[in-house]
């Protein structure tokens, strides 16, 4: 694999955890736990090949429509997993950032997020961006509200200025968006940042998306010609 032509920023919609669990007669919680294992493997592989930014779609603003028990279990997993991986962040130089409406989350989840961000803020091998309580439209709406409350004049507004009001404005646009699980849609993920992303839709359910499959998708990206409108 030619590392020079790899994407700088990869985003992944981790779809298929519940269907995987259902197919094996397991609870959705077990599906999410298995999905966490794949996520860690993908992080390790990204570090190995030199990808600098990796974004996971963890929980969307629309996911609140799910069963209360499932949401509670998922939030428990998120809060506990973030804190349990501090050694992993430090050993591998992983900087944690979070996109989404964090302030609307429960105190426990919010505290875990803030602790992870604070602990890893000086690491620089890989930026791991977790989209939690995230929706692309919601992010744009919050950015508009922040702009209106700022000192900027409307006539000065351009793409660069508007981007500065998005969550984590230091993040580059996505070069590659991968969605597992077989569905061909983007589900409100990073609407502003995927303008020129290459898209790959995999039929593989997320708990079965191993680094070998990820490697093939990265190679597929390398063979694509990106014109950026030219």
UniProtKB/Swiss-Prot annotation:
GO terms assigned for molecular function: ditrans,polycis-polyprenyl diphosphate synthase [(2E,6E)-farnesyl diphosphate specific] activity; magnesium ion binding
The protein's required cofactors: Mg(2+)
EC id: 2.5.1.-
Listed InterPro entries: UPP_synth-like (IPR001441), UPP_synth-like_CS (IPR018520), UPP_synth-like_sf (IPR036424)
CDD domains listed in its UniProt record: Cis_IPPS
Residues at which substrate binds: 16-20, 60-62, 64, 66, 179, 185-187
Annotated PROSITE patterns: UPP_SYNTHASE
Enzyme class: transferase
Transferase keyword on record: yes
Chain positions recorded as Mg(2+) binding sites: 15, 198
SUPFAM superfamilies hit by this protein: Undecaprenyl diphosphate synthase (SSF64005)
Cofactor note: Binds 2 magnesium ions per subunit.
GO terms under biological process: polyprenol biosynthetic process
Function: Catalyzes the condensation of isopentenyl diphosphate (IPP) with allylic pyrophosphates generating different type of terpenoids.
Subunit structure: Homodimer.
Family from the record: Belongs to the UPP synthase family.
Protein name per UniProt: Isoprenyl transferase
Organism, as annotated: Borreliella burgdorferi (strain ATCC 35210 / DSM 4680 / CIP 102532 / B31) (Borrelia burgdorferi)
Lineage of origin: Bacteria, Pseudomonadati, Spirochaetota, Spirochaetia, Spirochaetales
């Amino acid at each position: 694999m030619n590392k020079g032509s790899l994407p700088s920023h990869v985003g992944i919609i981790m779809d298929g955890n519940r269907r995987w669990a259902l197919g094996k007669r397991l609870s959705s919680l077990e599906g999410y736990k298995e999905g966490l294992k794949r996520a860690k493997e993908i992080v390790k592989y990204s570090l190995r090949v030199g990808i600098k930014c990796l974004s996971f779609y963890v929980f969307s603003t629309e996911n609140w429509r799910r069963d209360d028990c499932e949401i509670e279990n998922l939030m428990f997993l998120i809060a506990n997993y973030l804190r349990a991986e501090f050694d992993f962040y430090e050993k591998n130089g992983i900087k944690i950032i979070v996109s989404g409406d964090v302030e609307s989350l429960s105190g426990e989840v919010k505290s875990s997020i803030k602790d992870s961000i604070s602990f890893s803020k000086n690491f620089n091998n890989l930026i791991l961006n977790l989209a939690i309580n995230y929706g692309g439209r919601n992010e744009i709406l919050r950015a508009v509200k922040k702009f209106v409350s700022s000192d900027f004049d409307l006539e000065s507004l351009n793409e660069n200025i508007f981007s500065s009001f998005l969550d984590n404005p230091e993040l580059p646009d996505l070069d590659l968006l991968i969605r597992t699980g077989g569905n061909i849609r983007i589900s409100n993920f990073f609407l502003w940042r995927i303008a020129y992303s290459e898209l790959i839709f995999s039929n593989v359910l997320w708990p079965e998306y191993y680094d070998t499959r990820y490697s093939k998708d990265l190679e597929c990206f390398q063979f694509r010609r990106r014109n950026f409108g030219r």
